[in-house]
Amino acid sequence: MLIWLVELSEYFKFLNLFRYITFRTGAALFTSALIVFLFGPTIINSLRIRQGKGQPIRADGPQTHFKKAGTPTMGGLMILAGIVGASLLWADLSNVYVVATLLVTLGFGAIGFYDDYLKVTKQSHKGFSGKARLGIEFVIAGIAVYFMMRTALASGTAGSTFGSSIAFPFFKDFLINLGIMFVVFGGFVIVGAGNAVNLTDGLDGLAIVPVMIAAASFGVIAYLAGNVVFANYLQINFVPGTGELAVVLGAVIGAGLGFLWFNAPPAAIFMGDTGSLALGGTIGTVAVATKHEIVMAIIGGLFVMETLSVIIQVGFFKMTGRRVFLMAPIHHHFEKKGWTESQVVIRFWIIAVGLALLGLSTLKLR
C-alpha cells in the first residue's frame, strides 16, 4: 500500500526508498515482528481464557508431552496478523502473485482455525473431516494457481506456454507444458506444502524455524526470478512480478521471529493448524509462482521427510500390521528412542539449514 506514495517522491525524495523491494522486504520483516510482539501477549491471554484445557495431548505420545497440557493453540492468529498486516502496508497489492499468495495464506489459515476450534471444543484430535479439508484446500489453491498461470502466460517472457509449464533445476530451457492441468499440479504442490508443515509442527519451535529458513530461501529465489538481469545471469526462468513476493516472505520471517519468542520452550502457545497450514501454503504458492516447485522439495526436504514417514508408517501398517517407526511423524520416533525434545528440534534445524543451502546451490548449477 505504501508503495503508492512513490508518486509523491517528486516532492519528498525519501519516498524513493519505497521503490526498492529490498527496503520494503526489510520493513515488512520488522513490521510483522513488531505486530506479533505487541499483540502476542493479549492474544495468548485471550486464547488461554477461552480454551480452558488448551490443545489436547495425544495419549499415545511421548510422556514428556503431558506437561504441556493446558497450553493454548491457534497461535497462528498472531502469525497471520503479522503477515497480512505487514504485507498490506509494504507489498504491491496490485500484483497478482501477492494477492494469490495472501489468498492462500488466509484461506488455509481459516481452514486451520476451524480445525483447531473443533479439536479444542471437543478435546479430541479429530477435527475437520480430512476429505472436506483437502477438498477446500484444493479449491483455494486451484484458484490461486489459475490466476498466477494466466498472469505468467500473459507475460510471454519465456514462450507462450511458460505459465502452464513445469521448470526443472539445472536446465533452464527444459519445460514440460501441462496446459490447464498445471492448475492441478500447482494445487497439489500448495496443498502438499501446507499439510507437510502441519505434520512437522509437533514440538516447540520445530516447524517455525525451518519455515523461516524456507521463506528466506524463497525470498532470494523470488527476488532473483523477478529481476531480468539476475535471472539471465543465473540462467533461471524470468517471471516478471514475482520479486514482489520477497516482501511477503519478509513478513513471514518477521512473524515467525515474533511467534518464536512465545513458542520457545516451554511454549506459551502453539501455532496449531491455523499457523502451520497457512505457512506451508504460503511457501508452496511462492514455489509455484517462481517455477521452483521441484527445488522446494529440496529446500523443504525436512517437511518432505516428515510427510513420508507418516505415509510409510500408515501404508506399512495396513499391509503388514506392523510399524516401521516407533511413532510417526518421525520427530516422535526419535523422542521415543530417547532424544530430548531440544535435541530433536535443534538437529532438525541443522538439517533444514543444510537442505536450504543445497536448494539454493541449484540456482548456480546450470
Swiss-Prot record:
A GO-annotated cellular component: plasma membrane
Gene Ontology BP, a term: peptidoglycan biosynthetic process
Cofactor: Mg(2+)
Taxonomy, superkingdom: Bacteria
Biological pathway: Cell wall biogenesis; peptidoglycan biosynthesis
Enzyme class: transferase
Catalysis performed (reactions): UDP-N-acetyl-alpha-D-muramoyl-L-alanyl-gamma-D-glutamyl-meso-2,6-diaminopimeloyl-D-alanyl-D-alanine + di-trans,octa-cis-undecaprenyl phosphate = di-trans,octa-cis-undecaprenyl diphospho-N-acetyl-alpha-D-muramoyl-L-alanyl-D-glutamyl-meso-2,6-diaminopimeloyl-D-alanyl-D-alanine + UMP
EC number: 2.7.8.13
PROSITE patterns: MRAY_1, MRAY_2
Membrane topology note: Multi-pass membrane protein
GO terms, molecular function: metal ion binding; phospho-N-acetylmuramoyl-pentapeptide-transferase activity; UDP-N-acetylmuramoyl-L-alanyl-D-glutamyl-meso-2,6-diaminopimelyl-D-alanyl-D-alanine:undecaprenyl-phosphate transferase activity
InterPro entries noted in UniProt: Glycosyl_transferase_4, PNAcMuramoyl-5peptid_Trfase, PNAcMuramoyl-5peptid_Trfase_CS
Main location class: membrane
Transmembrane spans: 27-47, 71-91, 93-113, 134-154, 174-194, 205-225, 245-265, 268-288, 294-314, 343-363
Pfam families named in the record: Glycos_transf_4, MraY_sig1
Entry similarity comment: Belongs to the glycosyltransferase 4 family. MraY subfamily.
Role, per record: Catalyzes the initial step of the lipid cycle reactions in the biosynthesis of the cell wall peptidoglycan: transfers peptidoglycan precursor phospho-MurNAc-pentapeptide from UDP-MurNAc-pentapeptide onto the lipid carrier undecaprenyl phosphate, yielding undecaprenyl-pyrophosphoryl-MurNAc-pentapeptide, known as lipid I.
Full protein name: Phospho-N-acetylmuramoyl-pentapeptide-transferase
Provenance organism: Rhizobium etli (strain ATCC 51251 / DSM 11541 / JCM 21823 / NBRC 15573 / CFN 42)
Gene designation per UniProt: mraY
